[in-house]
Structures are given as structure tokens and as C-alpha cells.
Amino acid sequence: MRVVIQRVSHASVTIDGHCKSAIQKGMMILVGIEETDSWEDIDWLCKKIVNLRIFDDENGVMNKSILEDEGNILVISQFTLHASTKKGNRPSYIKAAKPEISIPLYEQFCNDLSCALGKEVKTGEFGADMKVELLNDGPVTICIDTKNKE
């Protein structure tokens, strides 16, 4: 699994002209799933995300997790995170998992992340054409890939 985490002042996702979900202060997370991703990847990633210390403490130092900061999370499925640009100029998405694999993993990721956060995680709609709006705070943007657990 590959995620791009952005610390946001607010974020929202619109589908067919209607706001599907919106959050205030917290994280907007793009998540891409590939064929070899597993339930173990979800567990590791959820723990990593909720414990990332990317929120400012009283001294302005990034020393608080989203749990301590009581922030919200918006998760957006994003198969293009697995784009390969090795050949030519048109990205290939062959590494992205097919829906029969990615949908159950995406749903489990969102459920497990809600449990780890202790409140509902807002989402877009898997496979939909979405308009995502956010105000990046910092900016703080973190990329994590479960195939490269550093």
C-alpha cells in the first residue's frame, strides 16, 4: 500500500457536484493499493498513521500525533499512486490492484483506521470521479509505502 498523507486545515471531496465528505483540521490521505498488499500491511499502516507526530505542540514543534491533536481524517482511494512512467509518456497503472482485490482492502483500511483513531474516518467513493479540495497546513506531506518500511 502506498499513501500520501497531507496535514490539512480543512479538506473535502465532491462527487457529481455534491459534497460527499469534509473535515476540518487533520489529515487528508490518498491511498493506492497494489496486487500484493495484505491485511498485515493495513495493520502496520494504520498504527503508523495515527502515531505520526506531525502536529505542532505548544512550542510549535511537530511533536503530537493526530490522536493527541484530536484531528480528523479524510481518506481518498487513488490508484494513480502506483503509476509507472518508465516507458513513454503515458503512465501505466498495471501495478494497481484490480477492484476485486482493492475494494475489500480499501474498506478494511478505512475501518481499521477509524478504530485506531477512535472516531469515524471520512471517505470519498471508491472508483468515482472526485473533486478533492484541501488547504495544506505547513505544508506537511508524508509518503509511506508498506513495501519499504523505513
Swiss-Prot record:
Alphabetical keyword list: Cytoplasm, Hydrolase, RNA-binding, tRNA-binding
Gene3D superfamilies the record matches: D-tyrosyl-tRNA(Tyr) deacylase (3.50.80.10)
Molecular functions (GO terms): D-tyrosyl-tRNA(Tyr) deacylase activity; Gly-tRNA(Ala) deacylase activity; Ser(Gly)-tRNA(Ala) hydrolase activity; tRNA binding
GO CC annotation terms, alphabetical: cytoplasm
Keyword Manganese: no
BP GO annotations: D-amino acid catabolic process
Subcellular location: Cytoplasm
Source organism, top-level taxon: Bacteria
Catalytic reactions on record: glycyl-tRNA(Ala) + H2O = tRNA(Ala) + glycine + H(+); a D-aminoacyl-tRNA + H2O = a tRNA + a D-alpha-amino acid + H(+)
Main location: cytoplasm
EC number from the UniProt entry: 3.1.1.96
InterPro entries: Daa-tRNA_deacyls_DTD, DTD-like_sf
Short sequence motif Gly-cisPro motif, important for rejection of L-amino acids: positions: 138-139
Tagged with keyword RNA-binding: yes
Quaternary context: Homodimer.
NCBIfam families: D-aminoacyl-tRNA deacylase
Domain commentary: A Gly-cisPro motif from one monomer fits into the active site of the other monomer to allow specific chiral rejection of L-amino acids.
Described function: An aminoacyl-tRNA editing enzyme that deacylates mischarged D-aminoacyl-tRNAs. Also deacylates mischarged glycyl-tRNA(Ala), protecting cells against glycine mischarging by AlaRS. Acts via tRNA-based rather than protein-based catalysis; rejects L-amino acids rather than detecting D-amino acids in the active site. By recycling D-aminoacyl-tRNA to D-amino acids and free tRNA molecules, this enzyme counteracts the toxicity associated with the formation of D-aminoacyl-tRNA entities in vivo and helps enforce protein L-homochirality.
Family classification: Belongs to the DTD family.
Protein name as it appears in the record: D-aminoacyl-tRNA deacylase
The organism of origin for this protein: Bacteroides fragilis (strain ATCC 25285 / DSM 2151 / CCUG 4856 / JCM 11019 / LMG 10263 / NCTC 9343 / Onslow / VPI 2553 / EN-2)
Gene: dtd
